[in-house]
Regions:
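Phosphate/nucleotide-binding beta-alpha loop and adjacent structural elements of enzyme active sites
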Residues: 1-241
Length: 241
């Protein structure tokens, strides 16, 4: 995440639960725990990651792994597996190959795509508590969003990787994500770009003006927070023993 989960402290609505699509190796787990969020649904398409994820989730009773690729329909697709793991995608490389010449697809594997709404209906009675959705699935984000209209009505926030060029062939662009999420009252309030044609965006339903100001001044806010962060670290590390 280009914007750390725990830098989202402006959030007026409490994050009760998270749906994280594109689990990979649970890199965001420590940040979620630090933010006191224990209810997390992880979705991952790559079967090679399942044993690692399940082993890591054993001590968390309120976290579960969904073993499928989030999409608009129940279908079978080929997942392209990359040599760095994180660039694996259901789509072929576009400008990604030019931007990251050392990254290649090394194999393919057949996976199922499912609409998130259908899977949640089959497996959860308390899906209303999952009001934060995080998507990082390498250009396939819009297809995944189209499979979760019911959950988007519930969500207060969507954090998503976005593209400004065809990083993956046929991938959704920022304007496409903006237009689609607007149907559910979700407006883009923050954006962080890289120089590689992609970035991260945060969408919210409430306090839009305040949220936009917050993200505009986030670099300054981080500097202001730094002494307090170091103070808390010192207290926890050396005093509370």
């Amino acid at each position: 995440m280009l914007i750390n989960f725990n830098d989202l402290f402006f959030l007026p609505n409490k994050v009760n639960g998270i749906i994280h699509i594109g689990a990979h190796k649970l890199e965001e787990l420590p940040d979620y725990l630090k933010g006191n969020v224990r209810e997390v649904i992880w979705i991952e398409a790559n079967p090679d990651k399942y044993n690692f994820i399940e082993e890591k989730l054993k001590r968390f009773d309120n976290m579960i792994l969904g073993k499928f690729a989030a999409g608009q329909k129940n279908e079978v697709h080929m997942l392209n597996l990359s040599n760095n793991g994180q660039s694996s995608s259901l789509l072929e490389f576009g400008t990604h190959k030019m931007r990251y010449p050392d990254i290649d697809y090394i194999s393919k594997i057949q996976v199922e795509t499912k609409p998130l709404d259908n899977w949640l209906d089959d497996n959860f009675k308390n899906k209303d508590q999952y009001n934060f959705i995080n998507l990082d699935i390498q250009g396939y984000e819009l297809e995944a969003l189209k499979g979760m209209p019911n959950q988007l009505k519930i969500a207060d926030y969507v954090y998503i990787e976005v593209n400004f060029e065809e990083v993956y062939r046929g991938c959704s662009q920022l304007k496409d994500i903006d237009k689609f999420l607007l149907k559910f009252g979700l407006l883009r309030v923050g954006l962080r770009k890289t120089d590689k044609g992609w970035g991260d965006a945060i969408y919210a339903k409430n306090n839009i003006f305040i949220a936009k100001l917050y993200y505009l001044f986030l670099p300054i806010i981080r500097v202001i927070k730094f002494p307090y962060t170091m103070y808390r670290f010192f207290i926890r590390r050396f005093i509370r023993r």
